[in-house]
Every structure is written in structure tokens, then in C-alpha cells.
């Protein structure tokens, strides 16, 4: 890679071009910061810029231009030859004209980092968008960083308790790990991520970073106001704020959506390197891939499977490998991942599976039964579900719950054709228990209180294990199914059963 320019070389830019021969010898060695180029072509989010010989910016450098009074940042994606570069715009390119001057900043996009970002909303290039004045910070950091080396990484296994029964019991989250929430449209990914922010971020003493990648602006706005109301953030940031928000929503050009996750991650990395335990929420990783696929064709790359960019695995890997726990501090990341047409084998969700410590799969068939969170207990996995980590009792209970549910699933065809009466007594008991377990896996959420009217519940891990242990051992076979629906602990289910019995009497 060519070296950065010295002040002398930068000054030399303004002189007339040297004779052809001398310039050719220099092109490989000189990369001038502050070099000025001209726009030669604009195709949507992709802009071509030509530079003088010997002034070619490096790949991933940020270029800046003025677009009708607004600062427009372009990121170099390709060298085209003939001293021309192809760039991706971080904002709308409407109004750009050929021949317009573009300046090389000499480095990648850099964003403000540090405590001053807490309580603020920023866009992909680190500009505040919450109308609360500039982000007063002296430290900035480039959004493109190398992943920490093996020696720096920490491998401690510890559980992060969420207070959500189905998660804590069957697919527990790792502290300092990567968690994926998979689901199609409208099965509750965003509600679940908001509940995790509510349960984990509020109880968590450290800092949180939320990256809104290509999702609804309304949800981003709601989250901002909820955080202020609940005391996680102060209006306009400042002392007492605990979360930084970075948004590149649905209405943004693909350049912004393809980079905004890296902007959020850069802020989280800075806190981690200062020794903090950081929570990093991303909604939605699929939009990061989708934005990459949008610009990929414009960059002239041949599409890969299902029309995705050929660099899909590389793009995902470069980002995911940076989300890691080091000996200095930890990043626990929760990522919502949209599943197109409910197809988990689609390349976008399938590529992210390999990077995760725990996967929570949301299922439409469970949502149709009115069971929320609509987590599929048989499809969700976690590397933390190991007797050496969670303990023998937790492991045994969770495996018994899964085997009971699996047995019910296997019997469903028989029930549909022949009915319940044709089952053996043993199978009837298993089906009755499985139906109670299914309902007991539901739980009222704090963030859904406004829709459901029922107050949210946070269930301690001991209570979750106790309740399900009793269920699989048949201690609650006498209670009706309805008693287990939308309650917190098993004691609440018993209370509800008494109420139902009193009403029926």
C-alpha cells in the first residue's frame, strides 16, 4: 500500500504536473492528502472521480465534496485505472454535477468516540442528527479497523441472564458473545431486541451502543424517546447518559446503510478498549448485506447466489470478527437478522450463523398460535448450553423440555389425521405437558405493555428452571393449559389456575 504524503508532497500537488516520465515513476510511491479530483460520472449511489497523476487516493479513503451546501462524503471502493476511482456516496447524490471538485481527506471515514457520544444520535459519518448541537469530543476513530489479534482475545464463558424464560432456559446468551435474533417479517425481532435493551441495558452498569441499520425511522424515534423517559439517556446527552445511537435508516442511500453498522461498532470498540463491558445492539444485520448487494452491481461486480454480492462472506466476516471480547473489555452484541421469505437457507442469514454464539429463531407458526415471544424452542441454539457452564440441573431440564416438545411435534401428524383419542396414555400425557410447556414459554413484555395491557415480567433464572422442572416431571399435570399462558414464574401460573377455577365455579 502506498505511503501517506508528507507536507512537502501535499504542497507539490498545487504545482503544474511534472513531465509524463517523472510522474509515472512517482505514482506508486506518492499518495497526496488534500489532493483535488473531479467528478466524471454519477450513477445513483456510485460516483467516479478522476485525479491528477500521482494523487490517487487509497481504497477506503474518504473523499469530500460540497453538494448544494451539504457536506457529501464518498468512500473509495475501486481503482479503475487512468487515475480514476469509483466511490460509494454516504448521502444522496442528487445535485452532483460532472466536473465538480472533490477533495481527498487522506484517511478513512472517522467518527467521534468517547463519553460525549452517549445520549446522542449520529449518522454514518458521525454528524449529530438530534438537533442538540455538535458532539464535543476531541477523539475520533476511523470506522475501518482490524479485528483484535488472537493473543488479545478473551475466552471466559459466562451467562448473560435476560429475564426472558425461553432464552435463559433453552438458548442462553454468552456475556461478551454474539447473539442473533432470526425471523421473517412481523414475527417480533424488533420487540424482542427492545425488550433486551429494557432488561439488560437498564440493569447493566456499563454503556450501550445501538446501531439502526436500514430499519424504520419511527422505531428509531420511539427508542430515542423511550430511553430518555426511562432514564437511560438524558435529553441532548451529557452526564448520566448510558447509550449512544447511530442511525442509517430505510430512507438512506445504500452507502450509508452499508457503513452505519461499522460506525456503531467503532464507538463500541472505543469503550471496550477503555476497559468497559459494552452492549452493542444492531437492528438489522440483513440490511447491511442488502445495502452491499445494492451497490455491488453498480460497482460492476458479477452477482453471486440469489443475486447477492460475491464478497458477502468477506463483508460479514470483516465486521463480525471485530465484535469480540478482549482482555481489556467486552462487547456483547445482539443482532436482529431478517430472514427473507422465512427461508433460513438464504445466503444472507446463513452467512451470519457461523459467527454467532447463540441463535434465537423466531417462528411464524408459533406467532400464529399467539405465543410471544415467538421463539422456536427446537430451532434456537447456544454454545452456552453445556453442563460445564450452566450446571447439570439447568442442562437436564432444558433437554427434557426439548425432548417433550420434539415428541409432540412428531405426534402432530397422527393427531391431525386420527385425533387425540388414538394416542397411547403415555403419549397423551406427553402432549398435554408439551402444550403447557409451549404456553409457559410465552411471557408478557415490558415494551409491549402499551399493546397488551398486561404488565411486563422479568423472571429469575432459578424460577425459570424450577417451573420447567416441575412441568416435565408432571407436578402441574392437574392445572389447566390456560393457566400457563402469558405469565411470569410458576407461582403466577398456580395463582392464575386458582382464579380460573373460581371463575368457572
From Swiss-Prot:
Its main location: membrane. ATP binds at residues 183-190. Its EC number is 7.1.2.2. Transmembrane segments: none annotated. It is found in: Cell inner membrane. CDD domains: ATP-synt_F1_beta_C (cd18110), ATP-synt_F1_beta_N (cd18115), F1-ATPase_beta_CD (cd01133). Gene3D superfamilies: 2.40.10.170, Bovine Mitochondrial F1-atpase, Atp Synthase Beta Chain, Chain D, domain 3, P-loop containing nucleotide triphosphate hydrolases. GO terms for molecular function: ATP binding; ATP hydrolysis activity; proton-transporting ATP synthase activity, rotational mechanism. F-type ATPases have 2 components, CF(1) - the catalytic core - and CF(0) - the membrane proton channel. CF(1) has five subunits: alpha(3), beta(3), gamma(1), delta(1), epsilon(1). CF(0) has three main subunits: a(1), b(2) and c(9-12). The alpha and beta chains form an alternating ring which encloses part of the gamma chain. CF(1) is attached to CF(0) by a central stalk formed by the gamma and epsilon chains, while a peripheral stalk is formed by the delta and b chains. NCBIfam families: atpD (TIGR01039). Produces ATP from ADP in the presence of a proton gradient across the membrane. The catalytic sites are hosted primarily by the beta subunits. This is ATP synthase subunit beta.
Amino acid at each position: 500500500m502506498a505511503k501517506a504524503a508528507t507536507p512537502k508532497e501535499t504542497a507539490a500537488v498545487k504545482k503544474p504536473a511534472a513531465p509524463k516520465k517523472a510522474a509515472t515513476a512517482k505514482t506508486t510511491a506518492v499518495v497526496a492528502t488534500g489532493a483535488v479530483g473531479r467528478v466524471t460520472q454519477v450513477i445513483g449511489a456510485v460516483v467516479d472521480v478522476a485525479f491528477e497523476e500521482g494523487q490517487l487516493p487509497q481504497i477506503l479513503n474518504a473523499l469530500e465534496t460540497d453538494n448544494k451546501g451539504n457536506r457529501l462524503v464518498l468512500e473509495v471502493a475501486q481503482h479503475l485505472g487512468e487515475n480514476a476511482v469509483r466511490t460509494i456516496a454516504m448521502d444522496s447524490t442528487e445535485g452532483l454535477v460532472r466536473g465538480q471538485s472533490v477533495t481527498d481527506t487522506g484517511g478513512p471515514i472517522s467518527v467521534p468516540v468517547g463519553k460525549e457520544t452517549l445520549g446522542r444520535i449520529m449518522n454514518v459519518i458521525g454528524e449529530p442528527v438530534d438537533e442538540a448541537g455538535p458532539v464535543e469530543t476531541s477523539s475520533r476513530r476511523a470506522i475501518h479497523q482490524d479485528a483484535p489479534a488472537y493473543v488479545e482475545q478473551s475466552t471466559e464463558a459466562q451467562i448473560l441472564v435476560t429475564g426472558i424464560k425461553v432464552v435463559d432456559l433453552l438458548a442462553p446468551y454468552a456475556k461478551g458473545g454474539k447473539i442473533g435474533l432470526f425471523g421473517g417479517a412481523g414475527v417480533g425481532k424488533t420487540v424482542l431486541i427492545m425488550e433486551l435493551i429494557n432488561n439488560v441495558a437498564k440493569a447493566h452498569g456499563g454503556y450501550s451502543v445501538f446501531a439502526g441499520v436500514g430499519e424504520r425511522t419511527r422505531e428509531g424515534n420511539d427508542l430515542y424517546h423511550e430511553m430518555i423517559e426511562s432514564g437511560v439517556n438524558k435529553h441532548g446527552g451529557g452526564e448520566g447518559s448510558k447509550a449512544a445511537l447511530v442511525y442509517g435508516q430505510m430512507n438512506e442511500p445504500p452507502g450509508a446503510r452499508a457503513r452505519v453498522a461499522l460506525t456503531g461498532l467503532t464507538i463500541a470498540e472505543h469503550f471496550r478498549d477503555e476497559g468497559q463491558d459494552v452492549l452493542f445492539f444492531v437492528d438489522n444485520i440483513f440490511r447491511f448485506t442488502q445495502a452491499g448487494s445494492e451497490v455491488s452491481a453498480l460497482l460492476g461486480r458479477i452477482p453471486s447466489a440469489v443475486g447477492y454480492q460475491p464478497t458477502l462472506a468477506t463483508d460479514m466476516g470483516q465486521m463480525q470478527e471485530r465484535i469480540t471480547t478482549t482482555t481489556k473489555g467486552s462487547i456483547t452484541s445482539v443482532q436482529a437478522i431478517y430472514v427473507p421469505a422465512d427461508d433460513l437457507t438464504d445466503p444472507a442469514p446463513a452467512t451470519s450463523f457461523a459467527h454467532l454464539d447463540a441463535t434465537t429463531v423466531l417462528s411464524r407458526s408459533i406467532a400464529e398460535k399467539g405465543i410471544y415471544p415467538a421463539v422456536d424452542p427446537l430451532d434456537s441454539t447456544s454454545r452456552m448450553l453445556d453442563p460445564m457452564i450452566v450446571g447439570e440441573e439447568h442442562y437436564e431440564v432444558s433437554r427434557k423440555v426439548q425432548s417433550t416438545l420434539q415428541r409432540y411435534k412428531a405426534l402432530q401428524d397422527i393427531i391431525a389425521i386420527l385425533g387425540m383419542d388414538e394416542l397411547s396414555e403415555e403419549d397423551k400425557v406427553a402432549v398435554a405437558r408439551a402444550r403447557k410447556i409451549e404456553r409457559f414459554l410465552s411471557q408478557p413484555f415490558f415494551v409491549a405493555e402499551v399493546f397488551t395491557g398486561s404488565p411486563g415480567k422479568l423472571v429469575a433464572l432459578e424460577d425459570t428452571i424450577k417451573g420447567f422442572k416441575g412441568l416435565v416431571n408432571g407436578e402441574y399435570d392437574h392445572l389447566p393449559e390456560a393457566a400457563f399462558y402469558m405469565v411470569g414464574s410458576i407461582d403466577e401460573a398456580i395463582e392464575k389456575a386458582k382464579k380460573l377455577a373460581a371463575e368457572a365455579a
